[in-house]
């Protein structure tokens, strides 16, 4: 299985993460996903009254230097880690 296919499989698995997954971890996944699928941030930072979108933008901006392949690989690793933690606490 290639990296892209593995990434897509883990993107589906990420949807099964428990509801108690921290916002911090969700934002890390969001940033890596956007970097892997879109590339560097291509929008302006949302205003200060739009906290949710601003946090998502910041998470994406934080991984801006990663290549598509690095972002995919890091995303897969993070999903595996979170699924492992969820299984251990179940």
UniProtKB/Swiss-Prot annotation:
Source species, domain of life: Eukaryota
Biased composition annotated in UniProt, kind: Basic and acidic residues: 1-16
A matching Pfam family: ACBP
InterPro entries the record matches: Acyl-CoA-binding_prot_CS, Acyl-CoA-binding_protein, Acyl-CoA-binding_sf, FERM/acyl-CoA-bd_prot_sf
Molecular function terms, GO-annotated: fatty-acyl-CoA binding
Annotated ranges, domain ACB: 3-88
Region annotation Disordered: where it falls in the sequence: 1-20
Binding site for an acyl-CoA: 30-34, 56, 75
Keyword tags: Lipid-binding, Transport
Membership in a protein family: Belongs to the ACBP family.
Family annotation (PANTHER family): ACYL-COA BINDING PROTEIN 1, ISOFORM A (PTHR23310:SF62), ACYL-COA-BINDING PROTEIN, ACBP (PTHR23310)
Function: Binds medium- and long-chain acyl-CoA esters with very high affinity and may function as an intracellular carrier of acyl-CoA esters.
Protein name: Acyl-CoA-binding protein
Organism: Ricinus communis (Castor bean)
């Amino acid at each position: 299985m290639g990296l892209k296919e593995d990434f897509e499989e883990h993107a589906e698995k990420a949807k099964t993460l428990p509801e108690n997954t921290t916002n911090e971890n969700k934002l890390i996944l969001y940033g890596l996903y956007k970097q892997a699928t879109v590339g560097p941030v291509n929008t302006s930072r949302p205003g200060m009254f739009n906290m949710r979108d601003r946090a998502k933008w910041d998470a994406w901006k934080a991984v801006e230097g990663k290549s598509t392949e690095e972002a995919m690989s890091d995303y897969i690793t993070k999903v595996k880690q979170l699924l492992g933690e969820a299984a251990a606490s179940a």
